[in-house]
From Swiss-Prot:
Prolyl cis/trans isomerase with specificity for phospho-Ser-Pro bonds. Gene3D superfamilies: 3.10.50.40. It comes from Arabidopsis thaliana (Mouse-ear cress). Its EC number is 5.2.1.8. Transmembrane segments: none annotated. It comes from the Eukaryota. The keyword Ligase does not apply. It catalyses: [protein]-peptidylproline (omega=180) = [protein]-peptidylproline (omega=0). This is Peptidyl-prolyl cis-trans isomerase Pin1. GO terms for molecular function: peptidyl-prolyl cis-trans isomerase activity. GO terms for cellular component: cytosol; endoplasmic reticulum; mitochondrion; plasmodesma. PANTHER family: PEPTIDYL-PROLYL CIS-TRANS ISOMERASE (PTHR10657), PEPTIDYL-PROLYL CIS-TRANS ISOMERASE PIN1 (PTHR10657:SF41). Keywords: Isomerase, Phosphoprotein, Rotamase. Belongs to the PpiC/parvulin rotamase family.
Length: 119
């Protein structure tokens, strides 16, 4: 359970050639990531977000299938965190969301994300 100054969130991360780490659980050698442009990653996430918001897809199921973060095995669940624990753009986007809302595309050194605030 998140304390008053903490939030709880899940996310879907798509890494691209500009990401600080070029490997993920589903692409251990980074072969796909190295050939994915930021623009392609953003377009993929926009399409995913549309499907989730329209009800065609479930956030957690999509996160499990496509997220480049190891949190994919938990449906993208990052658990609770407070200010200063995540990269600034990620933190600001998460704190700006209401519980249940899904962010627009958020850029960090890790890649591009959509975030769902869960508490």
């Amino acid at each position: 359970m998140a304390s008053r100054d903490q939030v709880k969130a899940s996310h879907i991360l798509i890494k691209h050639q500009g990401s600080r780490r070029k490997a993920s659980w589903k692409d251990p050698e980074g072969k796909i990531i190295l050939t994915t442009t930021r623009e392609a990653a953003v377009e993929q996430l926009k399409s995913i977000r549309e499907d989730i918001v329209s009800g065609k897809a479930n956030f957690e199921e999509v996160a499990t299938r496509v997220s480049d973060c190891s949190s994919a095995k938990r449906g993208g669940d990052l658990g609770s965190f407070g200010r200063g624990q995540m990269q600034k753009p990620f933190e600001e986007a998460t704190y700006a969301l209401k519980v249940g809302d899904i962010s627009d595309i958020v850029d960090t050194d890790s890649g591009v994300h959509i975030i769902k605030r869960t508490a």
